[in-house]
Regions:
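Periplasmic/luminal catalytic loop of GT-C fold multi-pass membrane glycosyltransferases
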Residues: 287-310
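Short periplasmic/luminal acceptor-recognition loop of GT-C membrane glycosyltransferases, typified by
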Residues: 246-282
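Hydrophobic/aromatic-rich transmembrane helices and adjacent perimembrane loops
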Residues: 14-15, 116-129, 144-201
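Membrane-interface alpha helices of multi-pass inner-membrane proteins
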Residues: 1-10, 16-21
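Membrane-interface helix-boundary motifs at transmembrane edges
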Residues: 29-42, 139-149, 195-206
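Membrane-lumen/periplasm interface segments of multi-pass, membrane-embedded glycan/lipid transferases
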Residues: 60-135
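Transmembrane alpha-helical segments
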Residues: 192-197, 206-232
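Perimembrane helix-loop-helix junctions
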Residues: 14-49
């Protein structure tokens, strides 16, 4: 499983391998209660070695599977943005985090309305996810469960990596890039609340702190239930795909926002490759982002092609 998860190249290092390796390493190095020459240290060393080998094999396997497909999105984890934009990223971070958690409020909404109450609960939940991991880190010395300690460090490793990439890099292009922080925050919060529950003096606090997590889970379940079963059939991409299939047009080219979506919705019965429209005499060029160069050559058994101008 580790090898398969590491086939996604740079992204797998940033979001999967690095937190695990960093969590195990920090937990062992900072455990002053256990001597270096112990069974725990040997187990941790073997874990790091196995994960490192799995990471290497996974990246090799991923490179073999990808072939010539260009994965430009992965460069967002390894490049700096213009320093003049860094402060703008800092200012945008709190709102981006809230919007990622589902904040959707207008300036005309009342505090006592349903939308207002939801917004307030979302703000409290955001504070909960930001503060509880800090409290867990402060209580680190009292936590004896090695798994919880590894999880705490894994969270802070991925948080540090994502924040550097968001504030100083290219991750700020999409708020969904912050989702790894939300994921590890929830895991750390659950593990920490479980630790609190086993202590009699903090059991009531644990129950109270579980309320924000319960709200989020129930709210998300409600949102999923509200989604119509055939909602995807109302999208423009689905309608375009059905039209192309009816016209027996099975291979062509379109802009990024239509090409891959239609290909997936039509289960590759209609294959559309990405092209970029230009203002020069060429008119368009091959879009190599998440594409294979061979897709723009003559295809075996294909005698007609189309260009979607939508």
């Amino acid at each position: 499983d580790f090898i398969i998860c590491c086939t996604n190249s740079t992204t797998s290092i940033a979001l999967f391998a690095l937190p695990i390796l960093g969590g195990v390493f920090c937990e062992r190095v900072l455990d002053i209660r256990t001597p270096w020459k112990s069974r725990k240290s040997v187990t941790a060393l073997l874990t790091l070695l196995i994960c490192a080998i799995g990471l290497y094999l996974g990246m090799k396997l991923g490179a073999h599977i990808d072939g010539d497909v260009q994965e430009g999105y992965a460069s967002a984890y390894s490049r700096f943005s213009n320093p003049d934009t860094w402060w703008d990223h800092v200012e945008a971070l709190p709102l981006a985090f809230l919007q990622l958690l589902g904040l959707n409020v207008q300036d005309s909404d009342l505090l006592a309305s349903i939308e207002g109450v939801r917004a307030i609960l979302t703000i409290f939940y955001a504070l909960f996810l930001a503060i509880v991991p800090i409290i867990a880190l402060c209580c680190y010395a009292k936590i004896e469960d090695a798994g919880v300690r590894v999880l705490i460090w894994a969270h802070w490793v991925v948080t540090a990596f994502i924040l550097v990439g968001y504030l100083c890099g290219l991750l700020s292009a999409g708020i969904w890039r912050l989702s790894p922080i939300v994921c590890t925050s929830v895991l750390v919060s659950l593990a920490f609340l479980r630790w609190l529950y086993h202590k009699v003096e903090t059991r009531r606090w644990c129950v109270l702190l579980c309320l924000p997590l319960a709200y989020l889970c129930l709210h998300d379940v409600h949102k999923v239930i509200e989604i119509p079963v055939n909602d995807y059939k109302e999208s423009i991409n689905y309608k375009l795909g059905e039209y192309l299939k009816d016209q027996n047009l099975t291979y062509g080219y379109a802009s990024f926002w239509h090409s891959q979506a239609i290909t997936v919705l039509e289960d590759s019965d209609v294959k559309i490759r990405t092209v970029n429209f230009t203002d020069d005499e060429r008119g368009l060029e091959a879009g190599l982002y998440q594409s294979n160069k061979n897709w723009f050559e003559d295809q075996p058994g294909q005698d007609q092609y189309f260009l979607l101008m939508q």
